[in-house]
Each structure stands twice: as C-alpha cells, then as structure tokens.
C-alpha cells in the first residue's frame, strides 16, 4: 500500500467534477496541527496553532470562537480566545477510540464572519466499519444480477455534433435495464483509430445534466458518464431542477423498506449494463474501469464488486458507507439517514446493509485508487477511512489534510492517470 499525505494549506481556484473547491477568502484562520502528518496515538493530546490573516497580512488581537468535536458529531467543547498578535494555540484534547477530532474556528471582522476547520486522526488505520454483513450478501447479488439475463442491451447512440472536437466524438447514449427502463449517459470516444481503455464515470448525488468528459477522452480513454434516473441527460436544466424538487426529491431513500424495492437496485444493475455497453464498443481494448466520488464513490465500489470484468477502481470520499454506525454512537455515511434514531427501523437497517459501500469494499478484487480529505463535512473521514481499511485488494490512498468534499486537481488528475495506465497494461 502506498500512502501519501499532502498537507497543503493554500487553495487553488478550480472546479473538480461535481465538487467545487472553495474560493480563497479575504480573512483566513489557519489551524495547523502540531503533528506534521496530523496523526496521533490514542490518549495523545492534539494542539493546533492558530494564525489569523487579512489579505495575507497579520490580523492581530482578534477574538476566535472555537469548538471541538469528533467527526460530524455534537461539539464536546465550545470556547473563545483572543490571539496574542495574530497567533494562538488551541488544546483540542484527545480520543480514546480510533477516529477523527475536528476544530471549528470562527472570527468576526468588519461585520463578516469567517469559518475554518482542521481535522486530525487518532490511529485512523485501526478504524473498521460497524455495518453488519448479511449472511446471504453474495447470494443475493448473484441472484439479482440474473435479472439482466432477460434484458436486451439494445444500445442507441446519437452524435452530439456541437460537443465534438477534432480529437473526440461525443454521443448521447442509452441502453436497456430491468423493468423496461433505460440508462442514459454521454459517451466521449477518441476519433483516432486504435484500441482504448474504457472508463465508466458514475455520478455524484443529484439530478442534473451531463456534458461528457472530453478532456480524458482526448488523452486516450473511452469515457462514459451515466445518469441514474432513467431519463436523458442532455435536457434543459430547469427540467432536472423540477424533478429534484418533485418525484425525485429524496430519491436516495425511495423504497428503503425492502431490499428488492430500494431505489439503488435498478441503479446497480444499470451500472453492470454500462460495463456490457463499454466492452461492446469496437474501439475498446478489452479493459474497463470505474471511477466516482461521493454517491459515485459508493457506485464505484458496488460496480467493481458486481462485475469482475472491471480491472481498476477509482473511489473518492464515498457516500453510503458504514451508514449503520450512527446506531452505535459513531458518525455514519451520507445521507446520514440513521443519525435520526427514529429512522433505525429493522427493515430500513437490513435493506441498507445490502447497499452499503463498506460491505462492497470488503469484497473487492480489482486494484483500487482511493482519495479523501480530513475536512469533509459531507462524507466524513471516519467512514472513508473505515471503508478503505477493509479493502483487501491492491490499493493506494491519497489523503488531503485540508480537503473537504472536493479534491485538488493534482489528486483527481492522479487518479485518472493511474486508471488509464492500469487499463493500458
């Protein structure tokens, strides 16, 4: 296993997939852990150096309101301090169990409030998921995949001429799925004759249009970005907004009362169909991988488990991982359904286990490139680390100490470059 920790503290302005890197603010409060790698032993005290800047210059004698909490859990401490000059120290305390401790600092200057976060790990390599593995997990999914035996792929490809370039053709595509539904996506295909690896890009949460990945297709990969809602993905944005507020509102919980009716059953099988589609393309070299973040991270884990033809798996800050952990007093995965203990009905919990990303991670065989950040307030590092730790396939991880629910360009580009290289062997 290769592990690289990049403690970068200056944000670059960039947009990465569906996750936007935050814009640099006028006032910054840097919270710097006293361990260079932000890793501590259980029982060891974590301290943070506080540095306040205004337009990059010292911001002296300002009051800092701060709180300390375990990852995505209620604050254990709320205090205030006044910096001496533009610096100070926060003693955050320790943890008795593996996990992550976070400091949130807020300053008010010239009528505006500015918030910063910094997170450290306490023996995070010892974290493991708390979600239970159903005894018939493998049997259930093997039987469920048999539903595809009766489904005709029946692919359709329509050229989107105004999106094509001198190097890449762009198509709006669709293919068959269970119950008479279809999956839709945007395919980017290198124009030059030859054989290319194929990559399935699975989406983050939401209902939205897709444009296709021309950049990586131009570098020598067939890329298919798919939607999961069974509707075309090149329509007007207003339509997707209306659907997200209407029939697809809170879709991640549709049918959760039963494993056979849950929303993602059709989606997972559609991802397997997408692999069939990619391998059917004449320009494919016979190799296919899958990549995705957040909801897409969960879909990447699930698809790699369900289809062993996949030989490379890219996952960043996966959602739907270790969701059950909330029921045992630890932070669980997005969408945080079980954070409300009233939602912990037996049938809901049992269904979620069959779809939990951590359970798929336990059974992966294809090589995995994994990435997440300690400051992720959507898919917390606790669930990302626990899920990574149970992967037994060949794996490597990139951790961004100050990354949230986004990745630096160097990290996401590194994942794509690794995948193309892996699929070109």
Where are these regions (language model features)?
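Short beta-strand element of the alpha/beta-hydrolase
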Residues: 185-189, 195-206
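C-terminal catalytic histidine-bearing segment of alpha/beta-hydrolase fold enzymes
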Residues: 378, 385-425
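Cap/lid segment of the alpha/beta-hydrolase catalytic domain
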Residues: 208-269, 325-333
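Proline/serine/threonine-rich low-complexity linkers at boundaries of modular beta-sandwich domains
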Residues: 21-29
């Amino acid at each position: 296993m290769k592990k690289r920790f990049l403690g970068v503290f200056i944000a670059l302005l960039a947009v990465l997939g569906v996750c936007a890197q935050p814009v640099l603010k006028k006032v910054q409060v840097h919270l710097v852990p006293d361990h260079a790698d932000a890793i501590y032993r259980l029982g060891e005290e974590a301290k943070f150096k506080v540095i306040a800047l205004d337009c990059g210059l010292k911001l002296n004698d300002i009051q800092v309101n701060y709180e300390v909490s375990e990852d995505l859990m209620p604050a254990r401490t709320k205090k205030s301090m006044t910096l001496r000059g533009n610096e100070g120290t926060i003693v955050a305390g320790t943890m008795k169990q593996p996990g992550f401790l976070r400091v949130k600092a807020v300053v008010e200057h010239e009528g505006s409030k500015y918030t910063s976060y910094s997170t450290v790990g306490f023996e995070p390599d010892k974290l493991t998921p708390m979600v239970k593995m159903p005894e018939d997990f493998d049997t259930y999914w093997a039987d469920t995949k048999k539903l595809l035996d009766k489904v005709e792929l029946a692919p359709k490809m329509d050229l989107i001429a105004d999106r094509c370039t001198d190097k890449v053709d762009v198509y709006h595509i669709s293919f068959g799925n269970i119950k008479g539904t279809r999956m839709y996506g945007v395919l980017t295909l290198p124009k030059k004759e030859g054989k290319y690896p194929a990559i399935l890009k699975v989406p983050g949460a939401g209902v939205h249009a897709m444009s296709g990945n021309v950049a990586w297709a131009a570098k020598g990969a067939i890329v298919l970005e798919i939607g999961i809602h069974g509707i075309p993905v090149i329509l007007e944005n207003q339509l997707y907004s209306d659907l997200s507020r209407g029939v697809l509102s809170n879709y991640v919980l549709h049918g959760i009362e039963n494993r056979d009716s849950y929303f993602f059953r059709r989606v997972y099988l559609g991802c397997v169909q997408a692999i069939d589609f990619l391998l059917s393309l004449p320009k494919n070299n016979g190799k296919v991988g899958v990549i995705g973040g957040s909801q897409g991270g969960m879909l990447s884990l699930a698809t790699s488990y369900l289809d062993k033809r996949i030989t490379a798996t890219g996952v960043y800050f996966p959602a739907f991982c270790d969701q059950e952990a909330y029921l045992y007093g630890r932070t669980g995965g997005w969408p945080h359904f079980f954070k409300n203990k009233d939602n912990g009905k037996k049938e809901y919990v049992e269904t979620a286990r069959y779809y939990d990303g951590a359970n798929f991670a336990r059974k992966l065989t294809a090589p995995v490139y994994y990435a997440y950040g300690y400051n992720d307030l959507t898919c917390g590092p606790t669930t990302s680390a626990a899920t990574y730790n149970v992967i037994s396939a060949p794996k490597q991880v990139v951790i961004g100490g100050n990354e949230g629910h986004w990745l630096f360009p160097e990290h996401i580009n590194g994942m794509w470059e690794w995948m193309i290289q892996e699929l070109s062997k």
